[in-house]
Amino acid sequence: MKTITLSELPTGQATRLSPSSIVVSTTPSEALDIDANRRLLNRYRFVQHEGMRILAGWLPRVATFELKCEMSRTLWEDALHVNALYLRLREIQSPAFQKPTDDALVTAMNEMLHAPDEFGLFLALYRVLTPSLIAALVSHETATFPNSDLPSVHAIKHALLDLRGQLERLEPLLAEAERAGKISEAARSWETYIRELVAFAGGVSGLEKRSARPPAPPACRVEFKVPLEAKRDERFTNLAADLEQMPGEDDYDGHTVEEFERYSTEMLAAETVGLVMFLVPSMPWEFQFDTARHLYDEVRHCLMGYEWMRGHDMNPFTSPQYLHIFKWRSQFPPVMQYCMLTMGNEVHAFPYRHRRVEAHQKSGDVLSEQFVRYDIADETQHVRFGKRWLPELIKQSGDKRSLEQYTEDALKVWHEQYRTGKLTINVE
């Protein structure tokens, strides 16, 4: 490929061209043809799409708080990348989403789910898979037609920005875990196994030299089981507390402390969204895209609580975690979990949130006011998600009730148990 410089243009033409008008001359034999292009884009899409579901399923099982937050952000950012690739792929292939024909890549992604522990998962993801994806995207960015395929280049450039940021944020956390002796031999064996699987697939691109034979699964492999309980790391000291009556709203200071302490526990909502997302893989892509955003919104709300508490010299790790709420929700079908969360928790919070905005304004507490207003904006969107997707979730579940009847029945359970704190948890 040869770049056309201004000096090479006919006299006077350079002054008539904007920078966006200057394109690169491309020799067809040097660039990816459109068939190779779409196969590669679909591989990248598949890797990140499958990665989203893996992260969603693992979220409740991961104990380390910082890793929970980062994996949630990765999931959301990966959803943005998959969506950009979806918009491009639907223009150059039909259907837009296709299972890759390379069984080696499919196997590598299937196996990612069965890591022995959270550190095995993160080593495999952030030290093997993501670096391989970055290498593939870097190569693709300059290998395709820079003008004819600019939509792909645009998507790749933005994905690279996020993916590099993920590694920059995660590597210090993994290094800290190594120094603390938290990374087991099983986790390291898992990293090696996934590295060998990816090598057998020729890397994420499939264009690298492939190893001669696939590795055998290591003894550390643990068949993934859907998590029905949420985990927290050793810094959390109050895991099973019951929800208590908050100080009255007329006690502004006391109530506000409890208000933001409750925000700090919204990881529970993110974990429920992740569980729902994992359990309904047949839902349309747009549902997965919306739930990825919903999930990370709840993590941001949790972090909002942490920020507020630390700013007021409080330790968020001593806050009650109410883990039994996740356990209670997880015993219901995913559609009911989603209904109770969006039509119960989210809808019924608005009158209270608006009162809190007014209270913070009257007290001159700008930070608290702004935090709650952003929360209201997010939760308004979550209710829209619920109204959009509950009909399809009910349909796919095979339930014959109408949306109205299903919602009424789900909210009856929510009011009788969640609102009263009398949670009935079935123990098998």
Residue ranges and their predicted role:
Residues 2-428:
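Non-heme di-metal
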